[in-house]
Amino acid sequence: MNAEILAVGSELLLGQITNTNARFISNQLSELGINVFYHTVVGDNAKRLEQAIEVAESRADLIIFSGGLGPTKDDLTKETIARHLGVSLEFDEVALTYIEQFFAKRGRPMTENNRKQALILAGSEILANHHGMAPGMIFNNNNHTYILLPGPPKELEPMFQFEAKPKLAAMLNDGGIIASHVMRFYGIGEAELEVQVQDILDAQTNPTVAPLASDGEVTLRVTAKAETEQQAQQLIAAKVAEIQALVGDYQYGMDDDSLASKTVEMLLDNHLTISAAESLTAGLFQSELAEIPGVGDALIGGVVTYAAEAKVKHLGISQELIDTHGVVSGECAAAMASAVRKQFGTNIGIGLTGEAGPTAHDHQPVGTVWIGIAINDEEPLTYLLHLSGMRNTNRLRAVKFTCHYLMQLLEERGYTKRY
Protein backbone atom coordinates (compact mmCIF):
# COMPACT_ATOMS: atom_id res chain seq x y z
CA MET A 1 0.00 0.00 0.00
CA ASN A 2 1.26 3.48 -0.93
CA ALA A 3 0.32 6.49 1.17
CA GLU A 4 0.39 10.26 0.92
CA ILE A 5 0.17 12.58 3.91
CA LEU A 6 -1.73 15.78 3.24
CA ALA A 7 -1.40 18.45 5.92
CA VAL A 8 -3.91 21.30 5.87
CA GLY A 9 -3.19 24.70 7.40
CA SER A 10 -1.86 28.05 6.24
CA GLU A 11 0.15 28.30 9.46
CA LEU A 12 2.34 25.46 8.15
CA LEU A 13 3.07 27.25 4.89
CA LEU A 14 3.85 30.47 6.75
CA GLY A 15 6.38 28.70 8.94
CA GLN A 16 4.49 29.55 12.11
CA ILE A 17 4.51 25.92 13.23
CA THR A 18 6.51 22.84 12.21
CA ASN A 19 4.77 19.90 10.59
CA THR A 20 5.73 17.32 13.21
CA ASN A 21 2.57 15.35 12.40
CA ALA A 22 3.97 14.18 9.06
CA ARG A 23 7.08 12.80 10.71
CA PHE A 24 5.02 10.98 13.33
CA ILE A 25 2.58 9.49 10.83
CA SER A 26 5.37 8.41 8.45
CA ASN A 27 7.16 6.66 11.28
CA GLN A 28 3.97 4.86 12.30
CA LEU A 29 3.20 3.83 8.73
CA SER A 30 6.70 2.45 8.23
CA GLU A 31 6.06 0.07 11.12
CA LEU A 32 3.11 -1.28 9.14
CA GLY A 33 5.15 -1.66 5.97
CA ILE A 34 3.23 1.13 4.22
CA ASN A 35 5.23 3.23 1.75
CA VAL A 36 5.03 7.01 2.06
CA PHE A 37 6.22 8.66 -1.13
CA TYR A 38 4.79 12.18 -0.73
CA HIS A 39 4.17 14.78 1.97
CA THR A 40 1.93 17.62 0.80
CA VAL A 41 1.07 20.82 2.65
CA VAL A 42 -1.91 22.94 1.57
CA GLY A 43 -3.17 26.21 2.99
CA ASP A 44 -6.71 26.89 4.12
CA ASN A 45 -8.09 27.13 0.59
CA ALA A 46 -10.78 24.74 -0.65
CA LYS A 47 -9.84 24.93 -4.34
CA ARG A 48 -6.16 24.17 -3.77
CA LEU A 49 -7.04 21.44 -1.28
CA GLU A 50 -9.28 19.72 -3.82
CA GLN A 51 -6.51 19.93 -6.42
CA ALA A 52 -4.12 18.34 -3.93
CA ILE A 53 -6.62 15.55 -3.26
CA GLU A 54 -6.90 14.80 -6.98
CA VAL A 55 -3.12 14.58 -7.29
CA ALA A 56 -2.87 12.36 -4.21
CA GLU A 57 -5.52 10.01 -5.58
CA SER A 58 -3.47 9.55 -8.74
CA ARG A 59 -0.45 8.23 -6.86
CA ALA A 60 -1.58 6.80 -3.50
CA ASP A 61 -4.03 4.21 -2.18
CA LEU A 62 -4.10 5.73 1.30
CA ILE A 63 -4.48 9.47 1.85
CA ILE A 64 -4.08 10.76 5.40
CA PHE A 65 -5.22 14.29 6.22
CA SER A 66 -4.10 16.25 9.27
CA GLY A 67 -5.83 19.44 10.33
CA GLY A 68 -8.91 21.35 9.25
CA LEU A 69 -11.45 19.55 11.45
CA GLY A 70 -12.06 22.43 13.86
CA PRO A 71 -14.98 24.86 14.33
CA THR A 72 -13.89 27.90 12.30
CA LYS A 73 -14.51 28.84 8.67
CA ASP A 74 -10.95 28.06 7.64
CA ASP A 75 -11.36 24.49 8.93
CA LEU A 76 -12.55 23.07 5.63
CA THR A 77 -11.08 19.59 5.26
CA LYS A 78 -14.31 17.64 5.81
CA GLU A 79 -16.38 19.92 3.62
CA THR A 80 -13.89 19.79 0.75
CA ILE A 81 -13.53 16.01 0.84
CA ALA A 82 -17.32 15.57 1.03
CA ARG A 83 -17.84 17.78 -2.01
CA HIS A 84 -15.01 16.09 -3.91
CA LEU A 85 -16.33 12.58 -3.26
CA GLY A 86 -20.00 13.49 -3.58
CA VAL A 87 -20.95 12.36 -0.08
CA SER A 88 -22.95 14.19 2.55
CA LEU A 89 -21.95 15.32 6.02
CA GLU A 90 -23.96 14.25 9.04
CA PHE A 91 -23.77 14.81 12.76
CA ASP A 92 -22.26 12.12 14.93
CA GLU A 93 -24.48 12.17 18.00
CA VAL A 94 -21.82 10.76 20.32
CA ALA A 95 -19.35 13.46 19.33
CA LEU A 96 -21.99 16.19 19.54
CA THR A 97 -23.03 15.11 23.03
CA TYR A 98 -19.40 15.08 24.15
CA ILE A 99 -18.86 18.62 22.85
CA GLU A 100 -22.04 19.89 24.52
CA GLN A 101 -21.02 18.31 27.82
CA PHE A 102 -17.53 19.77 27.53
CA PHE A 103 -18.91 23.31 27.55
CA ALA A 104 -21.63 22.56 30.11
CA LYS A 105 -19.15 21.19 32.66
CA ARG A 106 -17.07 24.35 32.39
CA GLY A 107 -20.05 26.68 32.57
CA ARG A 108 -19.21 28.19 29.20
CA PRO A 109 -21.66 28.94 26.40
CA MET A 110 -21.29 26.74 23.32
CA THR A 111 -21.27 28.75 20.12
CA GLU A 112 -23.10 27.36 17.10
CA ASN A 113 -19.93 26.85 15.09
CA ASN A 114 -18.67 24.31 17.63
CA ARG A 115 -21.36 21.92 16.40
CA LYS A 116 -19.39 21.75 13.17
CA GLN A 117 -16.74 19.65 14.91
CA ALA A 118 -19.25 16.78 15.26
CA LEU A 119 -19.84 16.56 11.48
CA ILE A 120 -18.58 13.39 9.80
CA LEU A 121 -18.58 11.95 6.30
CA ALA A 122 -21.70 9.80 5.87
CA GLY A 123 -20.70 6.14 5.96
CA SER A 124 -17.31 6.72 7.54
CA GLU A 125 -15.88 4.85 10.51
CA ILE A 126 -15.32 7.09 13.53
CA LEU A 127 -11.96 7.52 15.23
CA ALA A 128 -12.63 8.59 18.81
CA ASN A 129 -10.90 11.73 20.07
CA HIS A 130 -10.11 11.28 23.77
CA HIS A 131 -7.91 14.38 23.90
CA GLY A 132 -10.03 16.95 22.07
CA MET A 133 -13.41 17.53 20.46
CA ALA A 134 -13.38 16.75 16.73
CA PRO A 135 -13.53 13.02 15.93
CA GLY A 136 -11.38 11.59 13.19
CA MET A 137 -12.67 9.17 10.58
CA ILE A 138 -11.79 6.51 8.01
CA PHE A 139 -13.65 6.49 4.70
CA ASN A 140 -13.27 4.03 1.81
CA ASN A 141 -14.24 5.06 -1.72
CA ASN A 142 -13.25 3.78 -5.19
CA ASN A 143 -10.19 1.80 -4.05
CA HIS A 144 -8.93 4.67 -1.92
CA THR A 145 -8.84 4.95 1.86
CA TYR A 146 -9.10 8.42 3.39
CA ILE A 147 -8.13 9.02 7.02
CA LEU A 148 -9.00 12.38 8.57
CA LEU A 149 -7.13 13.41 11.72
CA PRO A 150 -7.17 16.59 13.84
CA GLY A 151 -4.20 18.95 13.58
CA PRO A 152 -3.02 19.32 17.21
CA PRO A 153 -0.33 16.68 17.85
CA LYS A 154 -1.69 15.93 21.33
CA GLU A 155 -4.91 14.82 19.63
CA LEU A 156 -3.51 13.37 16.41
CA GLU A 157 -0.83 11.12 17.89
CA PRO A 158 -2.98 9.08 20.30
CA MET A 159 -5.83 8.97 17.77
CA PHE A 160 -3.59 7.53 15.09
CA GLN A 161 -1.71 5.16 17.36
CA PHE A 162 -4.68 3.70 19.22
CA GLU A 163 -7.58 4.19 16.79
CA ALA A 164 -6.39 4.39 13.18
CA LYS A 165 -3.27 2.22 13.26
CA PRO A 166 -4.97 -0.97 14.52
CA LYS A 167 -7.65 -0.57 11.83
CA LEU A 168 -5.01 -0.13 9.14
CA ALA A 169 -3.13 -3.17 10.41
CA ALA A 170 -6.31 -5.24 10.21
CA MET A 171 -6.92 -4.04 6.64
CA LEU A 172 -3.38 -4.94 5.60
CA ASN A 173 -2.68 -8.17 7.32
CA ASP A 174 -5.67 -10.37 6.61
CA GLY A 175 -5.00 -12.11 9.91
CA GLY A 176 -1.21 -11.81 9.67
CA ILE A 177 1.13 -9.79 11.84
CA ILE A 178 3.64 -7.04 11.03
CA ALA A 179 6.25 -6.40 13.71
CA SER A 180 9.08 -3.90 13.73
CA HIS A 181 12.10 -3.04 15.89
CA VAL A 182 14.69 -0.29 15.59
CA MET A 183 18.40 -0.86 16.15
CA ARG A 184 20.22 2.29 17.33
CA PHE A 185 23.87 3.07 16.57
CA TYR A 186 26.33 5.82 17.46
CA GLY A 187 29.92 6.58 16.52
CA ILE A 188 29.48 5.37 12.93
CA GLY A 189 28.18 7.31 9.93
CA GLU A 190 25.25 6.26 7.80
CA ALA A 191 27.46 5.64 4.75
CA GLU A 192 29.93 3.49 6.68
CA LEU A 193 27.17 1.51 8.37
CA GLU A 194 25.50 0.89 5.03
CA VAL A 195 28.76 -0.43 3.57
CA GLN A 196 29.17 -2.80 6.52
CA VAL A 197 25.67 -4.27 6.12
CA GLN A 198 25.36 -3.88 2.33
CA ASP A 199 24.95 -7.62 1.69
CA ILE A 200 22.04 -7.71 4.13
CA LEU A 201 20.41 -4.69 2.52
CA ASP A 202 20.83 -6.15 -0.97
CA ALA A 203 19.38 -9.53 -0.02
CA GLN A 204 16.51 -8.34 2.16
CA THR A 205 13.05 -9.80 1.62
CA ASN A 206 11.36 -10.61 4.90
CA PRO A 207 12.40 -9.06 7.22
CA THR A 208 13.14 -5.75 5.53
CA VAL A 209 15.94 -3.50 6.81
CA ALA A 210 15.74 0.29 6.40
CA PRO A 211 18.57 2.68 7.43
CA LEU A 212 18.02 6.24 8.67
CA ALA A 213 20.37 8.93 9.99
CA SER A 214 19.28 11.74 12.31
CA ASP A 215 21.02 14.03 14.82
CA GLY A 216 24.31 12.20 14.52
CA GLU A 217 22.72 8.81 15.14
CA VAL A 218 22.00 5.99 12.71
CA THR A 219 19.14 3.53 12.97
CA LEU A 220 18.16 0.34 11.19
CA ARG A 221 14.47 -0.52 11.25
CA VAL A 222 13.90 -4.27 10.94
CA THR A 223 10.33 -5.17 9.91
CA ALA A 224 8.92 -8.67 9.55
CA LYS A 225 5.58 -10.07 8.44
CA ALA A 226 4.34 -13.46 9.64
CA GLU A 227 1.22 -15.36 10.59
CA THR A 228 1.81 -14.90 14.33
CA GLU A 229 3.53 -12.37 16.57
CA GLN A 230 5.96 -15.03 17.78
CA GLN A 231 7.01 -15.92 14.25
CA ALA A 232 7.51 -12.25 13.35
CA GLN A 233 9.64 -11.67 16.45
CA GLN A 234 11.74 -14.75 15.66
CA LEU A 235 12.41 -13.45 12.15
CA ILE A 236 13.43 -10.07 13.57
CA ALA A 237 15.66 -11.60 16.26
CA ALA A 238 17.55 -13.64 13.68
CA LYS A 239 18.11 -10.60 11.46
CA VAL A 240 19.15 -8.42 14.42
CA ALA A 241 21.74 -11.04 15.42
CA GLU A 242 23.05 -11.10 11.86
CA ILE A 243 23.47 -7.31 11.88
CA GLN A 244 25.04 -7.30 15.35
CA ALA A 245 27.69 -9.73 14.14
CA LEU A 246 28.82 -7.04 11.68
CA VAL A 247 28.32 -3.71 13.49
CA GLY A 248 27.38 -4.64 17.05
CA ASP A 249 30.25 -2.58 18.49
CA TYR A 250 28.41 0.58 17.48
CA GLN A 251 24.96 -0.42 18.71
CA TYR A 252 23.83 1.21 21.93
CA GLY A 253 20.16 0.24 22.13
CA MET A 254 16.82 -0.64 20.58
CA ASP A 255 13.49 1.02 19.79
CA ASP A 256 12.81 4.01 22.09
CA ASP A 257 16.20 3.89 23.83
CA SER A 258 18.33 7.03 23.88
CA LEU A 259 22.02 7.39 24.63
CA ALA A 260 21.11 9.06 27.91
CA SER A 261 18.62 6.36 28.93
CA LYS A 262 21.09 3.56 28.15
CA THR A 263 23.84 5.38 30.06
CA VAL A 264 21.62 5.71 33.12
CA GLU A 265 20.51 2.10 32.78
CA MET A 266 24.13 0.94 32.70
CA LEU A 267 25.04 3.07 35.72
CA LEU A 268 22.10 1.75 37.75
CA ASP A 269 22.63 -1.88 36.72
CA ASN A 270 26.23 -1.70 37.90
CA HIS A 271 25.60 0.46 40.99
CA LEU A 272 27.84 3.24 39.73
CA THR A 273 27.65 6.93 40.61
CA ILE A 274 28.56 9.87 38.40
CA SER A 275 29.25 13.60 38.60
CA ALA A 276 30.12 16.14 35.93
CA ALA A 277 31.97 19.40 35.45
CA GLU A 278 30.71 21.18 32.37
CA SER A 279 31.91 24.18 30.43
CA LEU A 280 30.59 24.40 26.86
CA THR A 281 27.59 22.15 27.63
CA ALA A 282 26.66 24.25 30.69
CA GLY A 283 24.79 21.47 32.49
CA LEU A 284 23.27 19.86 29.39
CA PHE A 285 24.91 16.49 30.10
CA GLN A 286 23.39 16.39 33.57
CA SER A 287 20.07 17.66 32.23
CA GLU A 288 19.89 14.84 29.67
CA LEU A 289 20.57 12.25 32.35
CA ALA A 290 18.11 13.90 34.73
CA GLU A 291 15.25 13.28 32.29
CA ILE A 292 15.56 9.53 32.92
CA PRO A 293 13.50 8.15 35.84
CA GLY A 294 15.58 6.66 38.65
CA VAL A 295 18.72 8.61 37.81
CA GLY A 296 18.86 9.98 41.37
CA ASP A 297 20.60 6.79 42.47
CA ALA A 298 23.42 7.43 39.99
CA LEU A 299 23.72 11.18 39.33
CA ILE A 300 25.11 12.70 42.52
CA GLY A 301 25.87 16.25 41.41
CA GLY A 302 27.97 18.51 39.28
CA VAL A 303 29.15 22.02 38.52
CA VAL A 304 29.06 24.40 35.58
CA THR A 305 32.44 26.09 35.34
CA TYR A 306 32.12 28.19 32.22
CA ALA A 307 34.84 30.74 32.92
CA ALA A 308 38.47 29.87 33.49
CA GLU A 309 38.27 31.54 36.90
CA ALA A 310 35.42 29.21 37.88
CA LYS A 311 37.51 26.18 36.96
CA VAL A 312 40.25 27.40 39.27
CA LYS A 313 37.95 28.44 42.13
CA HIS A 314 35.42 25.61 42.17
CA LEU A 315 37.44 22.68 40.83
CA GLY A 316 40.91 23.58 42.05
CA ILE A 317 42.44 23.39 38.58
CA SER A 318 45.80 25.09 38.57
CA GLN A 319 46.20 28.40 36.82
CA GLU A 320 49.49 27.08 35.48
CA LEU A 321 47.68 24.24 33.65
CA ILE A 322 45.24 26.69 32.09
CA ASP A 323 48.02 29.11 31.12
CA THR A 324 50.05 26.30 29.56
CA HIS A 325 47.37 24.27 27.78
CA GLY A 326 44.29 26.50 27.66
CA VAL A 327 40.78 25.71 28.86
CA VAL A 328 39.97 23.95 25.57
CA SER A 329 42.43 21.11 25.94
CA GLY A 330 42.64 17.47 26.87
CA GLU A 331 44.62 18.39 29.97
CA CYS A 332 41.86 20.69 31.18
CA ALA A 333 39.09 18.16 30.43
CA ALA A 334 41.00 15.45 32.32
CA ALA A 335 41.59 17.74 35.28
CA MET A 336 37.90 18.71 35.36
CA ALA A 337 36.82 15.05 35.32
CA SER A 338 39.24 14.05 38.06
CA ALA A 339 38.43 17.04 40.25
CA VAL A 340 34.65 16.68 40.09
CA ARG A 341 34.84 12.94 40.78
CA LYS A 342 36.84 13.58 43.96
CA GLN A 343 34.68 16.54 44.96
CA PHE A 344 31.44 14.53 44.85
CA GLY A 345 32.92 11.16 45.81
CA THR A 346 31.59 9.34 42.74
CA ASN A 347 32.82 6.38 40.74
CA ILE A 348 32.87 8.42 37.55
CA GLY A 349 33.73 12.03 36.79
CA ILE A 350 33.01 13.78 33.50
CA GLY A 351 34.77 16.89 32.20
CA LEU A 352 33.44 18.75 29.15
CA THR A 353 35.12 21.74 27.58
CA GLY A 354 35.30 23.17 24.07
CA GLU A 355 34.31 25.80 21.53
CA ALA A 356 30.61 25.47 20.72
CA GLY A 357 30.59 28.48 18.41
CA PRO A 358 29.73 30.56 16.54
CA THR A 359 33.03 32.32 17.35
CA ALA A 360 36.20 30.95 18.94
CA HIS A 361 37.58 32.34 22.20
CA ASP A 362 40.52 30.11 23.12
CA HIS A 363 42.46 29.98 19.85
CA GLN A 364 40.74 26.70 18.93
CA PRO A 365 38.52 26.08 15.89
CA VAL A 366 34.79 26.22 16.49
CA GLY A 367 33.50 22.70 17.07
CA THR A 368 36.57 21.59 19.04
CA VAL A 369 35.42 19.56 22.03
CA TRP A 370 37.40 17.73 24.68
CA ILE A 371 35.75 15.08 26.84
CA GLY A 372 37.44 13.84 30.00
CA ILE A 373 36.30 10.66 31.75
CA ALA A 374 37.69 9.60 35.13
CA ILE A 375 36.71 6.14 36.41
CA ASN A 376 37.56 5.34 40.02
CA ASP A 377 41.27 5.83 40.64
CA GLU A 378 42.35 5.35 37.02
CA GLU A 379 44.07 8.09 35.10
CA PRO A 380 41.41 10.10 33.24
CA LEU A 381 40.98 9.38 29.54
CA THR A 382 40.28 12.13 27.03
CA TYR A 383 38.56 12.28 23.66
CA LEU A 384 38.87 14.99 21.02
CA LEU A 385 35.94 15.87 18.75
CA HIS A 386 35.86 18.14 15.72
CA LEU A 387 32.18 18.94 15.28
CA SER A 388 30.56 20.96 12.53
CA GLY A 389 27.18 22.49 13.11
CA MET A 390 25.26 25.18 14.89
CA ARG A 391 26.11 26.03 18.48
CA ASN A 392 23.40 24.02 20.23
CA THR A 393 23.83 21.11 17.82
CA ASN A 394 27.49 20.91 18.81
CA ARG A 395 26.60 21.02 22.50
CA LEU A 396 24.06 18.21 22.16
CA ARG A 397 26.42 16.06 20.10
CA ALA A 398 29.12 16.55 22.72
CA VAL A 399 26.70 15.12 25.28
CA LYS A 400 25.83 12.17 23.04
CA PHE A 401 29.49 11.36 22.39
CA THR A 402 30.14 11.52 26.13
CA CYS A 403 27.45 8.90 26.74
CA HIS A 404 28.80 6.80 23.88
CA TYR A 405 32.42 6.84 25.08
CA LEU A 406 31.45 6.28 28.70
CA MET A 407 29.42 3.17 27.88
CA GLN A 408 32.27 1.84 25.74
CA LEU A 409 34.76 2.32 28.58
CA LEU A 410 32.51 0.66 31.12
CA GLU A 411 31.88 -2.30 28.83
CA GLU A 412 35.62 -2.69 28.25
CA ARG A 413 36.03 -2.89 32.03
CA GLY A 414 33.54 -5.72 32.32
CA TYR A 415 30.48 -3.80 33.43
CA THR A 416 27.21 -5.25 32.15
CA LYS A 417 25.22 -3.59 29.39
CA ARG A 418 21.74 -4.48 28.20
CA TYR A 419 20.47 -4.23 24.61
UniProtKB/Swiss-Prot annotation:
PANTHER family, A to Z: NICOTINAMIDE-NUCLEOTIDE AMIDOHYDROLASE PNCC, NMN AMIDOHYDROLASE-LIKE PROTEIN YFAY
UniProt-listed SUPFAM superfamilies: CinA-like, Molybdenum cofactor biosynthesis proteins
A Pfam family of this chain: CinA
Name of the protein in its database record: Putative competence-damage inducible protein
UniProt cross-references to SMART domains, sorted A to Z: MoCF_biosynth
Family: Belongs to the CinA family.
Gene: cinA
Coiled-coil stretches: none
Entries under InterPro entries matching the protein: CinA, CinA-like_C, CinA_C, CinA_KH, Competence-induced_CinA, MoaB/Mog-like_dom_sf, MoaB/Mog_dom
Organism the protein comes from: Lysinibacillus sphaericus (strain C3-41)
